[in-house]
Curated annotation (Swiss-Prot):
One GO CC term, this protein: plasma membrane
Assigned keywords, A-Z: Cell membrane, Membrane, Transmembrane, Transmembrane helix
Transmembrane segments: 21-41, 56-76, 83-103, 109-129, 141-161, 162-182, 202-222
UniProt xrefs under InterPro entries: Bax_inhibitor_1-related (IPR006214)
Membrane topology summary: Multi-pass membrane protein
Source organism (scientific name): Streptococcus pyogenes serotype M6 (strain ATCC BAA-946 / MGAS10394)
Keyword set includes Ribonucleoprotein: no
Protein name per its UniProtKB record: Uncharacterized membrane protein M6_Spy0327
Family the UniProt entry places it in: Belongs to the BI1 family.
Keyword field contains Transmembrane helix: yes
Compartment(s): Cell membrane
Source organism phylogeny: Bacteria, Bacillati, Bacillota, Bacilli, Lactobacillales
Amino acid sequence: MNDHVIYTQSDVGLNQFFAKIYSLVGMGVGLSAFVSYLMLYPFRENLISILVNQPMIYYGAAIIELILVFVASGAARKNTPAALPIFLIYSALNGFTLSFIIVAYAQTTVFQAFLSSAAVFFAMSIIGVKTKRDMSGLRKAMFAALIGVVVASLINLFIGSGMMSYVISVISVLIFSGLIASDNQMIKRVYQATNGQVGDGWAVAMALSLYLDFINLFISLLRIFGRND
């Protein structure tokens, strides 16, 4: 009887922790979507002007964005109060840079990619939480494959192969789908291993990881669905 009560309390605590992380992911994605919307519609002329006349603004934002990822991750793992604000600032800036990618695609393609990303995220999250198979090995393999994708993408910047870009996007979908599942399993295992004694900073760190999984999955699907746009 007591074991059942402890198990039930543990389940409730785990569900609450997942809810906290998913709410942070939702905040990040929502903020990115809002900023992208502003750039794509009310400030569309400014976006086009930057693309044509001041592309260095985009590249500068992308560099700052990369720095913020490491700063946010470091702050989160140290459990500092600054972790959440930095994550939200990063999400807003990412919405700005995403708008320069999204502007090249039809609205229906963007919605299709977003809804597909949400469906894959939901499905892989369930798999990650429910599966009893250890996914730590898969996680390492996905990160190794991700390095390969980055290298291939850099090479393709000079080659400009449409087919290579398509293959990279398909592989990226598989990689980030796997990372979504493994990240969710890691959240569950760390929570259980620490008996629920995990700080808010770690919740932000995992929210950032899942946010990046979702955004990169979305970009990959956008490129696949928008090949003819």
